[in-house]
Amino acid sequence: METLITISRWLAKQHVVTWCVQQEGELWCANAFYLFDAQKVAFYILTEEKTRHAQMSGPQAAVAGTVNGQPKTVALIRGVQFKGEIRRLEGEESDLARKAYNRRFPVARMLSAPVWEIRLDEIKFTDNTLGFGKKMIWLRDSGTEQA
């Protein structure tokens, strides 16, 4: 639990996620502002259905991605690598996520793009501020945490 709490605190302070999807051997990555839900261990993003990454995702797809800062020295590197699943939200689930997203990013009220959830199933958090190469791992299915 401690690992997930540490990772969640760091993710709550960031705001841009990069995620990649694959379809028929073709890979594509995208970036977006995200809202992190620590209870569901998921990102919420907005992206238009006509985008290449949304077309490749369809209603849901496997994803992998990263969240990282931009430190000027190796000793300050912190970042997350993850794998999970992206899906487009519908109905009340979408409405609730959009309200929370709009609170975090008020400018998003101007957008009509659908809300998507990236459910994280595996997270590796690198935090060089705790020592070079310090990694923490969290796995959804097993609840496993490694430091």
UniProtKB/Swiss-Prot annotation:
Name of the featured protein: UPF0306 protein YhbP
Highest taxon, organism lineage: Bacteria
Family to which the UniProt record says this protein belongs: Belongs to the UPF0306 family.
InterPro entries named in the record: Split_barrel_FMN-bd, UPF0306
HAMAP family: UPF0306
